[in-house]
Every structure is written in structure tokens, then in C-alpha cells.
Amino acid sequence: MLQRLPALALVQLTICLALSLGQPVRADEARPNPWPTGSSPGLTALAKAAEQNRYAYVFFWKTEGEATQRKRETFDAALATLGDRADAISVCVSDPEEKATVDAFKVSRAPMPLVLAIAPNGAVTKAWPLDFQAATAGDGIVSDGAASCMKALQGNKMVLLSVQNSLTSHAGEALEAAAGFLADPRFAQAAEGIVLDPADPAEATFLASLKVSPTTDKAMTVLLAPPGNPVATFVGAVSTAAIVAKVTDAKSGCCPDGKCGPGQCCPGGKCGPSQKSSAKGVSK
């Protein structure tokens, strides 16, 4: 399962990973800069970091004071340990000039100070409300594959993750099935396709969290639903129909007729594209 951000709808992003003609894209492909420049100092700084393919750690604060100063010193010291991998950005949420930044991350009511780690593609990869620890600063830097999946999931989209390379069998069939699913009008706007090389050492930790071996000799296709729950894993050859059936089964099992009733849950606690977004999760 992907790491879940703290239960703050405040840090949800609604930015989508671009697809080309319904085809899955490689996690390491260059992407458009997700941030506008000139709308606020914070977003301009984020755009600069993304342009240089660097992470950004944003220190959100509200009022000056001894406590804020101590937290800022801890933040600065922690960022120094990350070297040139990340830029440090400070945003005062009460500054009118930073309204666009505050609105982008929906942090106006978040407990302060708040630190967010943001990948070059715009995904929030880690959040530290109130208590940022230098020892865990590096946890915000994740692989390209993890960041790509997080970005799509934070946009409330499903992810169809194709794990394959030139050595895995059935790669062509699996990729064709994924492309067919992503081209289906029922899912085209509700899913993202991402391709990962299982032998990429940078993706080892992420793939291990999904129980995918880096030495797999068969293509693997993993379906993820927000906030990061694996719904299904297909090994080797798979068809578009099989993927659609798994999604349909997951939807119909918790939302009969595409409508989420009281006490019903959908994969990841969220309904699919044809379902109501107000579904409540069932308490265990």
C-alpha cells in the first residue's frame, strides 16, 4: 500500500498526470511544470524547483513567535542535510500575497506550522503537521514511480501500473490491455497509466510495498485506487476485459447500481467514476 498522507483533505491536490492517446506513460518521462509563476511567491518558488527537477519542502506558518522560530530552525537544519535534492520554501498563510499558494494546498485551516514535501511533478509525498522531525526529512523523497502514482491518486484517480521491461514475458499483451482500459470512455478521465521497470533499483522500495519482485520474469499490472490501495494484481498476459471486470466487481460490490448508500464503501473509501463521491467507509 502507498504511504497515506495525514487525514487532511487540506493537502489533497487535483492536478492530473498527462496521458497521450490513452497510452500509459513512463514514470521517468519529463512532465510539464505543474506550478504557475507570478501568482504568488510560494508557487513561483515551487515552479523554479520543479523546473530544476528538485523537490520542494514548504514550511507553512501563521504567526511569528518563539515556537515558530524553533520549528523554523529545525526545518532549516533538516533541509541542509538533503543538500541539493530539495529547496526550502517558507510560506506565511496569513500573507495576502500567498493566497494562491494557500488555496493550492487548502491549508488555510491546517494546524501550524505544517511542512509538506512536494515532488517535482507536484505530488505531496509527505506531510508533517505541527511536528517536523529532522530524522524523517528524507522520507519525503520518493522514487519517480511512487511520485507519479501519488500524484494521480491525490487527484482522486485510479492508477494502472504496468511493471515490465524487455526481459518480462507478455509485456506487449499487458501494455495493450492497459491502453485499452485507459481508452475506455468509462475510465479515461478516472484513471492514469504508468509504466515502471522492475529492475530499476530506484523503484525497489516502492515495488516491494506492492509485493512486486524486481526479478519478476512476467509483466505485472497493478490496479490502485485512492488513497493508494491495491485493488488487483495481474501476472503475465491480461486483457482489457479482465481489468474492466475487476473494476466493475469492486464498484458493484459496495455501490449497487452505481449508487453509494449509507454505510457502503468503495475501493479506497471512494466511489468510481460513475458513483457518488460522498460514500462513507465502513468502520471495522
Regions found by a protein language model. Name each.
Residues 114-146, 224-256:
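Non-catalytic, surface beta->alpha helical segment in thiol-disulfide oxidoreductase systems
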Residues 1-7:
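N-terminal secretory signal peptides that target proteins for export/translocation
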Residues 60, 83-99, 187-204:
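Thiol-based oxidoreductase modules, predominantly thioredoxin-like and allied folds used
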Residues 44-78, 151-186:
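Local sequence-structure signature of Cys/Sec-based thiol-disulfide redox active-site neighborhoods
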Residues 21-27:
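Sec/Tat signal peptide C-region and signal peptidase I cleavage site
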Residues 27-54, 134-156, 246-284:
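N-terminal leader/targeting and pre-domain segments
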Residues 9-20:
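Bacterial N-terminal signal peptides
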